[in-house]
């Protein structure tokens, strides 16, 4: 059965991170990468994804999973309107393998111009290293899929993990229509659990 149309899909590909940001909603990094079989098991039921968010931890630490996602959406013929990844701007986000994987995602997605931002965005806030920021900005700026998240002044945070400020993380319902359209934010976490929020 490959009938699902998903409005918002988020896959947490890793819980590893190379920073310890005080605002991190994920909490302490864990040495956990999503088993690739969980990605395949979910995507084999999907026909169309409007917005596909690849998250972590730091996504650039698990390029293998990003490549697997691209391989599966191609193999299953899944239409993806747009992908979205946020990086912390560390050295791994400047790696050739990460940039190549992002370029391949960008080529695959249907929409090249996104109203809400770019396919790959770097956090631009008071929590990240300015030296890393400058080096990553220089390395990634030439790519059409890259942009800065643009929230240096105001950051919307949930009060979870190490974050001591912000709002409670809301839990939203997931709804499946008779036409197999999934409404809501569907999230596959690194442990293989399907959740209604990230």
Please place each PLM-identified region on the residue numbering.
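Conserved alpha-helical substructure of the radical SAM core
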Residues: 1-87, 92-97
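Accessory C-terminal segments flanking Radical SAM cores
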Residues: 163-198
């Amino acid at each position: 059965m490959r009938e699902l149309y998903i409005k918002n899909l988020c896959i947490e590909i890793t819980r590893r991170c190379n920073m310890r940001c005080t605002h991190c909603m994920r909490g302490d990094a864990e040495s956990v990468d999503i088993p690739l079989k969980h990605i395949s098991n979910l995507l084999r039921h999907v026909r169309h994804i409007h917005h596909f968010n690849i998250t972590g931890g730091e996504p650039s630490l698990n390029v293998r999973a990003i490549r697997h996602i691209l391989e599966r959406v191609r193999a299953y013929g899944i239409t993806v309107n747009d992908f979205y990844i946020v990086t912390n701007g560390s050295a791994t986000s400047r790696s050739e393998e990460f940039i190549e994987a992002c370029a391949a995602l960008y080529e695959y997605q249907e929409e090249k111009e996104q109203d809400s931002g770019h396919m790959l965005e770097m956090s631009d806030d008071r929590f990240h290293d300015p030296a890393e920021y400058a080096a990553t900005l220089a390395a990634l700026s030439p790519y059409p899929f890259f942009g800065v998240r643009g929230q240096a002044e105001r950051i919307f945070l949930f009060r979870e993990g190490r974050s001591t400020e912000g709002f409670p993380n809301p839990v939203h319902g997931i709804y499946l229509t008779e036409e197999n359209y999934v409404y809501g934010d569907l999230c596959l976490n690194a442990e293989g659990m399907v959740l209604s929020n990230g």
